[in-house]
A protein has these predicted regions:
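Short acidic/polar inter-strand loop motif in beta-rich domains
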Residues: 111-119, 253-259
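Glycine-centered loop-to-beta-strand initiation motif
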Residues: 88-92, 223-243
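Bacterial N-terminal signal peptides
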Residues: 9-21
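N-terminal, post-signal-peptide region of Sec/Tat-exported proteins
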Residues: 48-87
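Beta-strand-rich domain onsets/edges
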Residues: 28-48, 132-194, 198-204, 213-219, ...
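Surface-exposed, short loops/turns at beta-strand junctions within beta-sandwich domains
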Residues: 97-102, 239-243
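Sec/Tat signal peptide C-region and signal peptidase I cleavage site
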Residues: 20-29
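Short amphipathic beta-strand segments in non-cytosolic proteins
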Residues: 71-79, 208-226
Length: 308
């Protein structure tokens, strides 16, 4: 088919998608980093460039850039500052100077606070973007019954200069973390790879794990694997194809029990609906009950799977 006809077909498909967008259910955006390389010779003077973004499809940035602060861990475990960092409208990019032989970890760790407080008889939500450092300023004077939960997100990718090493995988004991059984820069299609996930330093059992291959624009549908961690927090993934794979696991979220002796189903803030007047506990005009939030922890990594 001539290039002009292909371009016309693509534009027609995009226009049709835009027309149907209001009635479509949009997939949740994914946070990711994409390295320019995952393996280096190890000359002692090499450069790694990383893109960081939030998008619906991997790895095509289509959401506003986030206020992330990436860092790198060198093979000896020391923290390395990223260089040449720049933020655009849709992505953040930065460089890592690869000097030491071994495996580097590039990470973005973010904390936010969700919750609510009672003020003048009305329960109000904490503003979006609240962090542990700004929580005190986010709660107005006179507020009582403050409910809050710290949500932690960890995004990682890896690169190895020369032979792979494992010092950078020493867990911090905080949040969701990955400790590899199979080294993440030694992956091949058709081969099994095992990773262990820890929650606050302990095996994270029975958590759902998703592995998604990038390049969906050039594939007939999303290539996604859905698995579950075992009692030791381990999961084994057999990669069906080569590519840059995004692996994600999450825990928590929703809301806790409604009160002492009672329970309420987990629900997001969007799902909360006010009760009809007269049916409010405590009489008409009483504040609608909102259960305390539960901390949400998430982990995602981008790994390269080579052809076997």
């Amino acid at each position: 088919m001539p290039v002009k006809m292909i371009r016309t077909s693509i534009l027609s498909a995009l226009a049709m998608g835009a027309a149907l967008a209001p009635i479509a259910v949009e997939a949740a955006p994914r946070s990711w980093m994409l390295p320019s390389e995952t393996m280096f010779v190890g000359s002692g003077d090499e450069w790694l460039t990383v893109d960081a973004a939030l998008s619906t499809d991997l790895y095509y940035f289509d959401h506003a850039v986030q206020n992330w602060e990436p860092f790198a861990l060198a093979p000896d475990g020391s923290k390395v500052a990223v260089e040449n960092s720049a933020k655009g409208r849709l992505r953040q990019t930065f460089d890592v100077h690869v000097v030491q032989p071994g495996t580097y970890k590039i990470a973005i760790v973010s904390e936010s606070v969700s919750g609510s407080y009672l003020l003048n008889g009305e329960r109000k939500m904490l503003p979006r973007g609240t962090t542990p450092a700004t929580l005190a300023q986010a709660v107005p004077a006179g507020a009582t019954d403050v409910w809050s939960a710290v949500n932690t997100s960890r995004i990682e990718t890896f690169a190895t200069a020369g032979e792979p090493t494992t010092a950078v995988f020493k867990p911090t004991g905080k949040g969701l973390e990955m400790v590899p059984v199979t080294h993440p820069t030694e992956l091949a299609s058709g081969e099994a790879a095992t990773f262990q996930f820890l929650l606050d330093g302990k095996p994270a059992a029975d958590l759902s794990v998703s592995a998604v291959n990038g390049g969906v624009r050039y594939r007939d549908g999303i290539q996604q694997l859905d698995l579950t961690t075992d009692a030791e927090g381990k999961v084994t993934i057999t990669w069906p194809d080569a590519g840059m794979w995004w692996v994600n696991v999450a825990s928590g979220g929703g809301r806790s029990a409604a009160g002492p002796g009672g329970s309420a189903p987990q629900a997001s803030a969007k799902a909360e609906q006010p009760l009809a007047a007269g049916n409010l506990p405590g009489g008409e005009g009483a504040p609608r009950p909102i259960a305390p939030p539960r901390p949400r922890l998430s982990y995602s990594m981008t790994v390269e799977v080579l052809p076997s």
